[in-house]
């Protein structure tokens, strides 16, 4: 699961707690038993939504989708590994994929360390990747 992968990289000491919370959510139940550092991920207001989306597999959904799909990911994405984008692409009937060098989760091209990457999430002065914009326009014009 993507969130478990994220936690294993960013806060490995919380991985077992995360797995236990997901086990509870998969059973359709809500829990208030989680460490404070996981509050932003698992607060009580978010859990019903999480229970709902966990019932869906994006690979199965995109496999049934007949309309063209453009899958965009960056090789510097801290949240979604490019292998996830490739799994979607391989599952889709009619798709294109774009993996952008140095691009992160907020579609900004960042060179540097993880801290610089994370800081970019809150920097409105950074521009969306030109390559992403060009590819999106090209993709839409073909529809």
Name each model-derived stretch.
Residues 103-143:
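Catalytic active-site module of serine/aspartate enzymes centered on a nucleophile-bearing elbow/loop
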Residues 60-63, 86, 90, 134, ...:
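Solvent-exposed, polar/charged alpha-helical surfaces in well-ordered, non-transmembrane soluble domains
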Residues 76-80, 105-106:
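Acidic catalytic loop of the alpha/beta-hydrolase fold
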Residues 13, 54, 80, 127-132:
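Soluble or luminal CAZymes and related metallo-dependent hydrolases
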Residues 67, 80-94:
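Short alpha-helix in the alpha/beta-hydrolase fold that links the catalytic acid
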Residues 20-26, 96-110:
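Short, solvent-exposed beta-strand-terminating loops
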Residues 65, 71-73, 77:
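Short beta-strand/loop motif that positions the catalytic acidic residue
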Residues 1-52, 56-59:
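Accessory cap/linker subdomain of secreted extracellular hydrolases
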